[in-house]
Amino acid sequence: HKPYGVLSQFTPEPGSRWGCLAEHIPVPDVYAAGRLDADSEGLLLLTANGRLQQRLTDPAWGHWRRYWVQVEGIANPEQLQRLERGLMIQGQRTLPARASSIADPGLPPRNPPIRERKEIPTSWLALELREGRNRQVRRMTAAVGLPTLRLLRVAIDLMDGEAPLSLEGLEPGQWRAVSPQEELRLQGLLRRSPGRGGRAGGGKSGQGGGGG
């Protein structure tokens, strides 16, 4: 569970105010399969298997990633439909997504706290993407008039008919090894050919596996 203020890498950036994963995870020779921005939180899958890392982050495979997004304002049906249909972001249309309003998930307050304006209400969205362009979630919500205040990735769908890998049970900064069953599922990805779950558009949508 990557906390706020931590880069999705194990080496610090010189002069950066952000921390790095090595401050939280004492496991050598693993790397993030898909990044989260330093000001985002949530699920990172770490692996030493380069093929698995590539497989999970290749946008051509279209692994759904689920985010909880606290936004400024209250989403209306038209805004949700625009998020789902796809938006022009930096000259390129995003792939169709899944978007819905959700109740406050009751997360612990972020440290540092989000910046709220007393006169503007906030609300939560569940947003699922199959691609991961740079700061895509934030750009998408801003494009429909709902600036992002807080962003967490909560699940990654392995597209194998089983439940997605989930952040459940992990506090910020905590990590765990995958279970034997999860390990088998991940290895199964490397044996599967494109088909089940479908490809998401030939991989022309830019960097994969991020979005946050």
Feature-to-residue mapping (PLM):
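Intrinsically disordered, low-complexity arginine-rich tails of RNA-binding/processing proteins
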Residues: 195-212
